[in-house]
Amino acid sequence: MSKTDLLIVESKNKVASIQKYVPEHFLVESCIGHFRELKKKNTKDGKGLGIDVANNFEPEFVISEEKLSVVKKLKALAKNKTIWIATDPDREGEAIGWHLKELLNIPKSQEKRITFSSITKKDINDAIEKPKPLDNNMAESAIARAIIDKLIGFTVSPLLHKTFNNWHLSGGRVQSVVLRLIIERETAVRDFKSTN
């Protein structure tokens, strides 16, 4: 039987298990996680951010060098097939699904997003019976997080290097806040005066 449907998962370790449970006309393949990243060279901003700050913080994505062969294979397999996106049911999985939609030019009307909590015939086939569109809000939150991480990390870290003449220092979206909380707590402990 010819394969008319392509179901894409994140992990290549899940491919064989899922292939056993899908209908015969399905082919299961992996995108091996994230395959696009924010551009680092020849960016519109000229700073290597891959974020066009002047254009509403528009991200510039490129295919990761190490994933070029995976992308080439997925594009070839996707020709004349119905595409099913079965990436992990979390924010990053939704972002990977969004990137797949963009890469494979899947129109909104043909989005088939499925999730399942366990790799069983019942769960997988129940999901296939009830596909839904991608959750663009969740995908956009992952993309926004990547943009914020890059904006903060690529601007704060060089400032720390220059200010303290120490190339081992870095700053980030989470790291900087956690460091401040630790310092505040340590200061409170040090300044504590017992009332006994």
Summary of predicted features, one role per range:
Residues 1-155, 177:
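Intrinsically disordered, low-complexity regulatory segments
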Residues 145-196:
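Prokaryote-biased recognition of long, low-complexity C-terminal linker/tail segments
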